[in-house]
Amino acid sequence: MTPKDKQLANSIYLILAALFIASLVTSNLIFQKFFYWEPFGWYRFEISVGILPYPITFLITDILSEIYGKKKANQVVIAGIFASFFSILIILAADFTTAINNSPVNNETFHQVFGLSPFAVFASMIAYLFAQFIDIRIFHFWKQLTKGKHLWLR
């Protein structure tokens, strides 16, 4: 691989990592809004909008696994978890501060939107971490089983 190709590969990796982290953190910020989904009019599901970015994260880890390998994909997952916890700490710190009288967002509104249940978020992040690691492991299991062929199967 030429130095130019290496630089391009690194740039693509960083872009994919940034998209992964942005999707993960965004899902944690928007999870409190819900909508109804009625596939084919058969059943009505009440779903958090926080689920919308999730498929993007799994697609990105599959792309990273295919191109950069299991180790690099796992590194992005761990970086995403750290970014999520860090953003939660910032939000909690912001929630503990007192808004000034003429603030466009008062304390109650801010807390209602961003006042996270730390235990629920922690449990969600741990479940997500395991789901991502399992996804990456299964992806590589199928890749090894098919000897790198049948990408559609993975």
Task: Please describe what each predicted stretch is.
Residues 21-36:
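Alpha-helical transmembrane segments of multi-pass membrane proteins
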Residues 84-103, 124, 128, 132:
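Transmembrane alpha-helix/helix-exit interface in multi-pass inner-membrane proteins
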Residues 94-119:
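Membrane-interface interhelical connector segments
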Residues 13, 17, 72-82:
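Cytoplasmic-side transmembrane-helix entry/capping segments in multi-pass membrane proteins
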Residues 48-52, 122-129:
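Hydrophobic alpha-helical transmembrane segments of multi-pass membrane proteins
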Residues 3-18:
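N-terminal membrane topogenic signal
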Residues 146-154:
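Internal alpha-helical transmembrane segments of multi-pass membrane proteins
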Residues 52-63:
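Central hydrophobic cores of alpha-helical transmembrane segments in multi-pass inner-membrane proteins
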